[in-house]
Regions:
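Thiamine diphosphate
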Residues: 1-126, 133, 141, 320-321, ...
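Glycine-/acidic-rich phosphate or pyrophosphate-binding loops and their flanking alpha/beta elements
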Residues: 6-10, 223-246, 259
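Glycine-rich beta-alpha junction loops
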Residues: 105-107, 167-174, 252-254, 305, ...
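Conserved thiamine diphosphate
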Residues: 115-168
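Conformationally flexible catalytic loops at phosphate/diphosphate-handling active centers
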Residues: 160-238
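Generic long, charged, amphipathic alpha-helical segments
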Residues: 258-291
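Peripheral docking tails and interdomain loops at the edges
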Residues: 302-354
Length: 354
């Protein structure tokens, strides 16, 4: 069924299609419509909606639901996601699946309600304590807000891990037609869960191992999961990269601006391509490195002071120059402004290699 939806509403439609049965949350702009929509749709589809007293309460309730084998989720924006970090670390340490949606706003502190991508480090690098990672998927359309939420639930159960969907206020608030899937994804058996019967009485959900050797074993087991994710769960999209001399790397709303800029630049004879990471962790390192060997330079376009660019530089490993085009504080560049920078880069790069 095709519907005109806000990005935030599409998240909940995807969650329902994925078989999510529990939402715990605390409202915060620009993510509040997720809680509002969940409060209606989950009870209508056999689930529960519980408004928490805080974001700390939200993530701890989610820990409990996940321990019982329930597909559960929460959502917030940067200030609330910061408060959840302890609980997310506990979920990772206890190998509990669940989905956390971060609709980013400008920061640090209370910031403002403008569009920004400043939560990249917080989410992608793991803002909580200890040695853990979380898969992170970054949509760039309202359709993907729905589809990647479904995918996030599937990955969460496949690896028994918390998973993020990372978007921004523009994607959360914009409206686009969405094909909403009617068929629910298949939920796997969870023999490890604690459901209050004799069969699961001896199951233990914990992240505390006082013996040093046992804690090291846990971390080694987690690392094996992350290695498998890096082999199997990398997602990206390319646009006009086959003959590109300059490559743009961008995600989320920035990638839409970047694509428009690439189209304009191509029409003016500038050979530009776009790589859009869809999975921010695991990052498309291998493919980016391959493309870096074919282009003169790379532009990273992001709405932060420079966070994505660190992963790009790591992937490229000095093969080609990497430059940053950024806006912060809720400001966004136009496609035309990006084109002007791309023309400068092409002129400088081709001149250097002439």
């Amino acid at each position: 069924m095709r519907r005109l939806l806000k990005g935030n509403e599409a998240v909940v439609r995807g969650a329902v299609a994925a078989g999510c049965k529990a939402y715990f949350g605390y409202p915060i702009t620009p993510a509040s419509e997720i809680a509002e929509t969940a409060s209606v749709l989950l009870p209508e589809n056999g689930g529960i909606f519980i408004p928490a007293e805080s974001e700390i309460g939200s993530i701890q309730m989610m820990f409990g639901a996940a321990s019982a084998g329930v597909r559960a989720m929460t959502a917030s924006s940067g200030p609330g996601i910061s408060l959840m970090q302890e609980g997310i670390s506990y979920m990772a340490g206890a190998s509990l699946p669940g989905v956390i949606v971060d609709i980013m706003r400008a920061g640090p502190g209370l910031g403002n309600l403008g569009v920004e991508q400043g939560d990249y480090h917080l989410v992608v690098k793991g803002g909580g304590h200890g040695c853990y990672r979380t898969p992170v998927f970054a949509p760039n359309s309202v359709q993907e807000m729905c589809d990647l939420t479904i995918h996030a639930f599937e990955v969460a159960d496949r690896y028994r891990t918390p998973v993020y969907v990372l978007a921004d206020g523009a994607l959360g608030q914009m409206m686009e037609p969405v094909e909403v899937p009617q068929k629910k994804s298949v939920e796997p058996e969870k023999p490890w869960a604690v459901v209050g019967n004799a069969a699961t009485r001896k199951n233990l959900i914990t992240s505390i191992y006082l013996e040093h050797e046992r804690q090291e074993i846990l971390i080694t087991e987690l690392e094996k999961k992350y290695e498998e994710m890096e082999r199997s769960e990398v997602l990206w999209q390319e646009f006009l990269t086959e003959d590109a001399e300059v490559l743009v790397v961008a995600y989320g709303i920035s990638s839409r601006i970047a694509r428009a800029a690439v189209e304009i630049a191509r029409a003016e004879g500038v050979r530009v391509g776009l790589l859009r990471p869809i999975s921010l962790y695991p990052f498309p390192t291998k493919r980016l490195r391959q493309l870096a060997g074919k282009v003169y330079s790379i532009m990273v376009l992001e709405l932060s002071s420079g966070q994505l660019i660190e992963d790009v530089r790591l992937a490229v490993s000095g093969i080609t120059p990497v430059q940053l085009l950024r806006r912060t504080g809720g400001m966004m560049p136009t496609a035309e402004q990006v084109v002007q920078e791309l023309k400068k880069m092409e002129s400088e790069s081709v001149g250097n290699y002439a």
